[in-house]
A protein has these predicted regions:
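Active-site helical microenvironments for divalent-metal-assisted chemistry
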Residues: 1-179
């Protein structure tokens, strides 16, 4: 592992310190970005160090007080831009005022898929590695109904991201959906 990748690993672990993932047996949050990076490297055969670093940092802007400037100054403009590109945008309070939970989920899902469709090829590759990690965890952590809904969203994601982006990751996500 290069010094730069090691620094990104330490950055991610530190940024997510004290956070846990969802579920009854919630692992430390840092396990997720590490899995995303490993998915990129070993399932996706990605050896682009910037993308591996983005895999480690992809949730830092939305889940921690980390700033875009902090990421860019530590890891460069390409990493900073990709992490920003992967950061979800949430509906405004006005958009969800008086809206039922299921309808909010549909709104957020539609927003996410629209964002993914506009992402760069590199960001879409990281998104596939992220979704692979998330769908595996969701199988264990979500109720049957929520997991079924999540699988539907994942199938839509596979329709938005072309298989040619990264056949190894795309096929792995598809296999999880079919499982």
């Amino acid at each position: 592992m290069s010094a730069r990748l090691h620094a990104a690993l330490q950055f991610a672990v530190s940024a997510h310190a004290g956070q846990d993932r969802d579920g009854e047996v919630a692992p430390p949050y840092a396990c997720h970005p590490i899995e995303v990076m490993l998915n990129l490297r070993y399932t996706g055969d990605v050896d682009d160090e910037d993308l591996l670093i983005v895999g480690l940092l992809h949730d830092t802007l939305e889940e921690t007080p980390t700033t875009p400037v902090g990421i860019e100054s530590a890891f460069g403009p390409r990493v900073g831009a990709l992490v920003q590109e992967l950061t979800r945008h949430e509906p405004t309070a006005a958009e969800v005022a008086g809206v039922k939970k299921d309808e909010i989920w549909k709104l957020r899902s539609g927003m996410l898929l629209a964002e993914i469709e506009k992402m760069s090829a590199d960001a879409q590759v990281v998104k596939l590695a992220d979704r692979l990690s998330n769908v595996r965890e969701a199988r264990i952590a979500k109720s049957a109904a929520k997991f079924a809904r999540y699988l539907g969203q994942t199938q839509s994601l596979l329709e938005v991201i072309a298989r040619k982006r990264n056949p190894g990751l795309w096929d792995a996500v598809k296999a999880e959906v079919a499982r």
